[in-house]
Amino acid sequence: MSLEPAMTTPDVLRVEVLSEALPYIQRFRGRRVVIKYGGAAMVREDLRDAVFRDVALLASVGVEPVVVHGGGPEINQWLNRLSIEPVFQEGLRVTCPDTMDVVEMVLVGRVNKQIVNGLNRVGGRAVGLSGADGGLVQARTHGDGSLGLVGDVAQVDPSVIIPLLDQGYIPVISSVAPNHEGQPYNINADTVAGELAAAMDAEKLILLTDTPGILRDRDDPESLIDQLSLSEARELIHAGVVAGGMVPKTECCIRALAQGVRAAHILDGRVPHSLLLEVFTNSGIGTMVLGSRQQG
C-alpha cells in the first residue's frame, strides 16, 4: 500500500494552472494594464464578481491595473425613467444637455462607485475618478458637433494616477471629461482607455466585449483569430473582415499600439475570468494584437 499522499484531479489542475501562470506573473509585475470594462460583464452579477476578483488578483501579484468604464445599459434605464428618449447615430449616443446630465450622474455618481465598492469588497484598493479629476482627460467636440456633447480625447495627463498606482491603488475612471472651458462631454470608454494606455506607456490594453474577439467569419465563433500584427489588423479592416461595431474597437487598439502600447486584447467578457485566462495562460482566450515594439 502506497504511503504517498494522493492528489485529486482538481488539485493537480490547480497546481498546473499556478505553474503556468508564474512566468506571466513575473513578466508583468510592475507593468501597467488598462482594462476597458463594459458589456455583459457589467450587467450579470456573476460576471461582475469574476471581473472584480480578476482585477484585484492582478493588483495583488504586482500588476498595475487601471479600469476605464462606460455604463450604457444603466444610462438608458435612467433616461427612460426621466422620459428622455435615447438616440444613437452610428453607434454613438446623441447627447443633448439633459442627456449629458444623466450620463454624468450615472457614470460618475453611480456606476463608478459600484465598481469601486465591488473591487474593495474582494480585497482590492480601488479609487474612483472621472476624466475631470486632476486634469486627467481633456475633451473636444466629436466631428462636426451634430451629436451634441459627444467628445473625443484631446489630451491625457496621467500624472494624477501614477502616484495611486505606486501606492498599490486601482484607479477606476469614468469616461466623462470636460473641454478646455469646463463643459463635460460624453466620451466613448474604448477611446478613453486606448488613449490613456498610450499616455501611460502601458504594457497592455484590454477591451472586455460581448464577442469572442476578432473573427474571420463573424457568423462563426470558431473562426476566432488569436493573434494579429498591427499591419494585419489594418488589413482586416480594409478587407471588410472586421466590420460593424468591431471596427471602432479594432481601430482603438491600432491607435494605442501605434503610440507604443505593447499589446492590445479584445476579450469575451461573457466568459468568467476571461482577464486571467488571457493574461496568465499560454493559450489565452481572445484576440491579441501585437504592437511593433512587442514584435521586435
Curated annotation (Swiss-Prot):
**Annotated GO biological process:** arginine biosynthetic process via ornithine; L-arginine biosynthetic process
* Disulphide bonds in the chain: none
Subcellular localization, per the record?
Cytoplasm
- Record key words, sorted: Amino-acid biosynthesis, Arginine biosynthesis, ATP-binding, Cytoplasm, Kinase, Nucleotide-binding, Transferase
Under the heading InterPro entries, the entry gives: AceGlu_kinase-like_sf (IPR036393), AcgluKinase_fam (IPR004662), ArgB (IPR037528), Asp/Glu/Uridylate_kinase (IPR001048), Glu/AcGlu_kinase (IPR001057), NAGK-C (IPR041727)
> Which NCBIfam families is this protein grouped with?
argB
Spell out the protein name for this chain: Acetylglutamate kinase
**Can you name the source organism?**
Synechococcus sp. (strain RCC307)
Q: What is the lineage of its organism?
A: Bacteria, Bacillati, Cyanobacteriota, Cyanophyceae, Synechococcales
